[in-house]
Amino acid sequence: MKAPPFAYRRVDSVAAAAALLREHGDEARLIAGGQTLLATLGMRLSEPSLLIDIRGIAEMQGIAVADGHLRIGALARHVDVERSALVARHLPLLSLAAPHIAHAAIRNRGTFGGSIAFADPAAEWPACTVAADGALTLSDGTRSRTVAAADFFLGLYQTALRPDELITAVQFPLPGPQRRFAFTELARRHGDYATVGLALAGDVTDGRLDDPRIVYFGVGGTPVRARAAEAALAAGRAEPAALDRAVAELGGELAPAGDLYAAAATKLHLAGVLLRRGIQSLMAEDAQS
């Protein structure tokens, strides 16, 4: 594989990157970790005339807690999130999901914001961001705006990002002491894209589940929040009958497409299997705390 010819510019500010995006339009691509872009260049699936290297933008770096939120800079690598003590303490859902992202070599280079911006429907971070009520800070270098993760993913590889905007950070509200998380996915091999995956959150107190978030990935063009299944489980003890009702609701909420490895009916069945596993993990975490 050989990439097509391209010009290269390295920038150190969001404003500079946005200005180049406005100047060059569809002919420009941002590059940070490059774990998706480099592959598409090599296969000639993408032939931009300009690559804009944004790795040196300081305001897009780092992981911090302030003002009741966990802030993850868009340029934080997957491995940074995986190893972060702040993430493990305040938002363990991300710590649970990180080891499932591809392989170590990719996690060492790929970026948190890059994965979210690419919006692969089988990727882990988009679903986790929705399940944890994340909000994205988008900037064109002059103005910034905040978009809830639930409103950011519009369709297959489509997002609310404007052509001259960058994701600079993702903010997560710090969860309360009763918030519990679970993450599970099924893949043919570790590191492969998930056939079906689930990010799960809920308040658990004395065996009672409140305010659940059930977000699937790999079953649609975007992360899919299973609201009817949530309603079947909310304000209950997640007993077998309630869990059966929640699994039954998935048939009306998920419309997975079959592929070479699993038929649509198989994926729907697996979604129910993951929900049972995830709820069991969620409730077990409360029993151990």
Question: Model-derived features: where do they sit?
Answer:
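C-terminal structural segment of proteins
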Residues: 1-289
